[in-house]
């Protein structure tokens, strides 16, 4: 079994040719939120992944094996509930309200401009339908938010402005 103990977020800094040559593996959210797991890559190799505790693997991340080989992670399609405003009388605010109620329940949630995604839960689905939202069971990749206290952001200030923090993936320049 090949051991992996390093993660490069979104393959940052790697040449595109290296990413094209890397093996891949599809992992669902249940596995990607664990820091230790076993998996098989597209080359058929058995992998033992041992990342620092609390590490979450995202689709697009690249894992580095002990032999130097790279493995690109894809978020596997999995059963999720896709939540959208009612097409006849819903508004974008309905999604904001739904996100608030789901957040109060500490539900892992993927936020998109036009929809939300959560793991299947018939009680939550009924609650959302009662809020006049459309809830559809689909099979799609799931990338929930890290949460307000997750690590990985960066802090900086702007000439005379108070310091503030941007989350992972923020690409704007100042």
UniProtKB/Swiss-Prot annotation:
GO terms for cellular component: cytoplasm. Keywords: Chaperone, Cytoplasm, Nickel, Nickel insertion. The keyword Iron-sulfur does not apply. The lineage of its organism: Bacteria, Pseudomonadati, Pseudomonadota, Betaproteobacteria, Burkholderiales. Residues 154-166 have a biased composition (Basic and acidic residues). This is Urease accessory protein UreE. It comes from the Bacteria. Involved in urease metallocenter assembly. Binds nickel. Probably functions as a nickel donor during metallocenter assembly. Belongs to the UreE family. One of its GO terms (biological process) is protein folding. The keyword Lyase does not apply. GO terms for molecular function: nickel cation binding; unfolded protein binding. Residues 146-174 are annotated as: Disordered.
